[in-house]
Amino acid sequence: MSNSLISDRKINCSRQAELELLKAYPILFMIIIHVYENLSVGRIDPTPRTYLEHVLQFLAGPATAPAYMFAMGVGIIYSGNNAPKLLFRRGLRLFLGGYALNAARSGILTALGTALTGRFDPELTKYLFLNMDILHFAGLALMMSSLLFGIKIKPLTIVGVSLILQLIGRRLAMLPEMTSDFSYIAGHFYKCSPAGCFPLMQWYIYPAFGILFGTVLQRVSDLKAWYRQLGL
């Protein structure tokens, strides 16, 4: 890649339309897949059974979560509120908002189910309320980034940190699966139970690369030429 395309000063500081689309697409498909899984008449198997399910699972899975997290990393750089303290507060609000969402989408249905059937499943209720999803991860990722920014870690080093975290997380995930309540806490950081979908150690690599990409993108003098060199 030609260094002539990279300036030593920031040029592209306004939000980029292509990256806004990159954020919008995952949100759309995450909404679609969650509505489909929760409101489908048929039983949803882990393995897709139909062509439609294959398409939905791919577009809302491997092609969505990493793209959203990468775009989030770019957004951190382009945000006017990325000072460490502000970033940490935003992350904390998102993290707590994840549990508020759990309560909102599960609490009413759990209460109705208990009232109608007279049966109460404490383990299922605990899972529904404490399950970690992408909103919790986003909050943790922002708080993690705020700590790294606070100690003046450079973007390339942040990527290195994320690689180390992923290696550690993968090793920890090889330990026997937890069944205790502690798994709901540990699951925020590495995959140790079904309750944690996006543990920080194994997924932070995507926003980390987004942070690096956004830092470079702000200094690109010719975006079209640069994207061409990237094969995009």
PLM features per residue range, with description:
Residues M1-L232:
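Alpha-helical transmembrane segments and their immediate juxtamembrane cytosolic regions
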